[in-house]
């Protein structure tokens, strides 16, 4: 879901607004979040809302992945969980760097590629036998 909202951000060029983190303007939640009517359209067409939801999903996903990797690593020393733990921090950092650099192409491309790496690491961790997780 986070990757899908990232695609919305890229497709709408929504990363070109609110180039600060964690604030979006003068608040954490953008003032024009629900500017369009009907309200559900904001989820897909409102640049500020799309960027906000990608940020929120990224933080939530990051927290879940960190907790999962830390818990799984306690039961096994398989290196995939170390890579997963470290990569999620790198991915969030790349997302923030993409924003503050006003979507500098090399950083933005690495952030998109990083999403593929993170997804691959999550799948690899889930493919281990349950007793290894």
Tell me what each language-model feature is.
Residues 1-133:
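Polytopic transmembrane helical bundles with strong interfacial aromatic enrichment
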């Amino acid at each position: 879901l986070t990757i899908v909202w990232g695609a919305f951000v890229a497709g709408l060029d929504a990363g070109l607004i609110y180039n600060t983190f964690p604030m979006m303007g003068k608040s954490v939640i953008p003032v024009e979040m629900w500017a369009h009517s009907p309200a559900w359209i904001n989820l897909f067409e409102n640049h500020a809302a799309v960027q906000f939801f990608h940020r929120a999903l990224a933080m939530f996903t990051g927290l879940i992945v960190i907790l999962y990797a830390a818990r799984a690593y306690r039961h096994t020393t398989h290196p995939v969980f170390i890579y997963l733990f470290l990569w999620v921090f790198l991915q969030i950092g790349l997302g923030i760097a993409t924003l503050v650099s006003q979507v500098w192409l090399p950083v933005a491309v690495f952030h998109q590629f990083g999403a593929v790496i993170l997804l691959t690491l999550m799948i690899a961790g889930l493919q281990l036998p349950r007793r290894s997780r």
